[in-house]
Amino acid sequence: MHSSALLCCLVLLTGVRASPGQGTQSENSCTRFPGNLPHMLRDLRDVFSRVKTFFQMKDQLDNILLKESLLEDFKGYLGCQALSEMIQFYLEEVMPQAENHDPDIKEHVNSLGENLKTLRLRLRRCHRFLPCENKSKAVEQVKNAFSKLQEKGVYKAMSEFDIFINYIEAYMTMKIQN
């Protein structure tokens, strides 16, 4: 609670220091962010399309890793944390393993990771989109299921990356409308 009060004070002070009519670079990029989001999601989908077939062909499992409960977390009060944790999960656990499965896809997986890092950076700069601290149970379930699948977990997680992009889109659409 104290950290949110401190954050509010810092935001207020920053706003007071900025001259009228001139927004800070961060404010300007946050104002443009909702308009840039469809382009960022399209870029993620385009890069993913280059590796989608590879991972979906290797995914021989019938279960779903990214379940409806994760989407519900994205849409609920834990949306911010669920999104943040899932981005971190893909960047730190899934993609480093995915890069090592075939030299032909390494560059594309790396590019996908860079696009995801850019999205995360923009979300963090615009605090209204990613102001969170709580843990998501649905994300924990995804991580546990991923771990249990061992090597097959990479194929499963990467083959469902398009679902993850859809969940990001649902979360951001909800945030933009609020």
UniProtKB/Swiss-Prot annotation:
For the keyword Disulfide bond, the answer is yes
For this UniProt record, the keywords arranged alphabetically read as follows: Cytokine, Disulfide bond, Glycoprotein, Secreted, Signal
SUPFAM superfamilies according to UniProt? 4-helical cytokines (SSF47266)
Entries under InterPro entries matching the protein:
4_helix_cytokine-like_core, IL-10, IL-10/19/20/24/26, IL-10_CS
Q: Which domain of life is it from?
A: Eukaryota
Listed GO molecular functions?
cytokine activity
Q: Which segment of the chain is annotated as a signal peptide?
A: 1-18
Q: Which pairs of positions does the record mark as disulfide bonds?
A: C30-C126, C80-C132
Localization per record: Secreted
What SMART domains does the database record attribute to this sequence?
Answer: IL10
Which GO cellular component terms, listed alphabetically, does the Swiss-Prot or TrEMBL entry include? Answer: extracellular space
- Residues with attached carbohydrate: N134
Pfam families attached here?
A: IL10 (PF00726)
- GO terms for biological process? immune response; negative regulation of B cell proliferation; negative regulation of cytokine production involved in immune response; negative regulation of inflammatory response; negative regulation of interleukin-6 production; negative regulation of membrane protein ectodomain proteolysis; positive regulation of B cell apoptotic process; positive regulation of cytokine production
Subunit annotation:
Homodimer. Interacts with IL10RA and IL10RB.
Q: Which family does it belong to?
A: Belongs to the IL-10 family.
Q: What does this protein do?
A: Major immune regulatory cytokine that acts on many cells of the immune system where it has profound anti-inflammatory functions, limiting excessive tissue disruption caused by inflammation. Mechanistically, IL10 binds to its heterotetrameric receptor comprising IL10RA and IL10RB leading to JAK1 and STAT2-mediated phosphorylation of STAT3. In turn, STAT3 translocates to the nucleus where it drives expression of anti-inflammatory mediators.
Q: Indicate what this protein is called per its UniProt record.
A: Interleukin-10
According to its UniProt entry, this protein's organism is Cercocebus atys (Sooty mangabey)
Task: List the lineage, top down.
Answer: Eukaryota, Metazoa, Chordata, Craniata, Vertebrata
Q: Which gene encodes it?
A: IL10
